[in-house]
Amino acid sequence: MASSASKFIKCVTVGDGAVGKTCMLICYTSNKFPTDYIPTVFDNFSANVVVEGTTVNLGLWDTAGQEDYNRLRPLSYRGADVFVLSFSLVSRASYENVFKKWIPELQHFAPGVPLVLVGTKLDLREDKHYLADHPGLSPVTTAQGEELRKLIGATYYIECSSKTQQNVKAVFDSAIKEVIKPLVKQKEKTKKKKKQKSNHGCLSNVLCGRIVTRH
């Protein structure tokens, strides 16, 4: 129990500026949408979280997507276990930058680290007033998000809204699963090996017993 409880997972959010990364983190950690002041970068956060029976200590790191932070941002990538790569469902540019900017950056500074692809601001995609105020806007569809997920090799693609809290928890649950999945598989393999060894021992005893009986 102690080993699973002490497992630390460093989760880093990345993506263009103004896609809602900080709001998503605030919403996840406080269960409310920030209406007054939204900081540029969310303070690092750590808490014990239980996902599928496994307790982990989840550490959340926020990053600023603006170009001014291009040199500083990669310092947050060191030791990352998983990335939450975000784009806005109502920003075609942020969607395109996932493949053009963020994947090359992550592959350069943190190769091999798994990621969860997230489309934010889900509530605005169907908001008639918002769409009317932004003529010519072409929201990203679920199918296009899935297509991008396959292209970048992400296991999960989740659409969420910090304002309504829809799927926000699912984002970070998926990030945790992405890290603990190999650990669970390894535990299962170890259990299987122990069981096979135990069964082999029992079989040997039975055979030995038979030999003794024949004598």
From Swiss-Prot:
One of its GO terms (cellular component) is secondary cell wall. Coiled coil: none annotated. InterPro entries: P-loop_NTPase, Small_GTP-bd, Small_GTPase, Small_GTPase_Rho. GO terms for molecular function: GTP binding; GTPase activity; protein kinase binding; protein phosphatase binding. A motif (Effector region) lies at residues 37-45. Keywords: Cytoplasm, Cytoskeleton, GTP-binding, Lipoprotein, Membrane, Nucleotide-binding, Palmitate. One of its GO terms (biological process) is negative regulation of abscisic acid-activated signaling pathway. A lipid is attached at residues 202, 208 (S-palmitoyl cysteine). It is a lipid-anchor. It is found in: Membrane; Cytoplasm; Cytoplasm, Cytoskeleton. SUPFAM superfamilies: P-loop containing nucleoside triphosphate hydrolases (SSF52540). Its main location: membrane. Belongs to the small GTPase superfamily. Rho family. Component of the active ARAC10-IRC5-KIN13A complex. Interacts with ICR5. This is Rac-like GTP-binding protein ARAC10. The lineage of its organism: Eukaryota, Viridiplantae, Streptophyta, Embryophyta, Tracheophyta. The gene is ARAC10.
